């Protein structure tokens, strides 16, 4: 049934994402977009996890793909190791409700309820965006409370260069 077909594919796809470096690419894009902002690395974790969630649908694959880059960045900026881990775990968990792929449960819902998967994905879009907005705001307020700055512009990748060189 659904479990043996789709769960196997999630595991296989997660391994593929790791080998191809897509997790690093998402972190680099997120860094270019938000690394400069107050508390930059934590906001990078939120964006990169949302991006990875669009293709993996697995919180574990998401942590592996982006957490190995974002957690050390957050600790280097001054976040506690506990907060850095919590941000990555929270942001990565959102990948399970981030369309279009989402978690295996979305496929099960579509099958059990008898609606097309695309309807389940459309219904999840607004809650997923609200979830990530909540994580972003939590990160923002903690960064302001702690006086944490972003990453200097000269240390950030240029998003246009990233898209031209690695966005294929």
List each language-model region with its residue ranges.
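Core transmembrane alpha-helical segments of multi-pass membrane transporters/permeases
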Residues: 1-24
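Hydrophobic alpha-helical transmembrane segments
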Residues: 4, 42-44, 121
């Amino acid at each position: 049934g659904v479990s043996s077909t789709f769960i196997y594919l999630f595991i296989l796809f997660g391994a593929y994402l790791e080998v191809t470096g897509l997790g690093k690419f998402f972190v680099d894009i997120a860094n270019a977009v938000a690394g400069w902002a107050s508390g930059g690395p934590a906001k990078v974790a939120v964006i990169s996890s949302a991006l990875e969630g669009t293709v993996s649908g697995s919180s574990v694959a998401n942590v592996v793909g982006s957490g190995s880059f974002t957690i050390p960045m957050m600790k280097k900026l001054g976040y506690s190791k506990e907060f850095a881990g919590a941000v990555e775990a929270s942001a990565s968990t959102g990948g399970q409700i981030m369309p279009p792929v989402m978690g295996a449960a979305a496929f099960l819902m579509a099958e059990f309820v008898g609606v097309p998967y695309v309807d389940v994905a459309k219904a999840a879009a607004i809650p997923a965006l609200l979830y990530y907005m909540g994580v972003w705001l939590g990160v923002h307020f903690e960064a302001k409370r702690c006086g944490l700055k972003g990453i200097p512009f000269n240390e950030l990748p240029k998003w246009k260069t990233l898209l031209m060189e690695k966005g294929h």
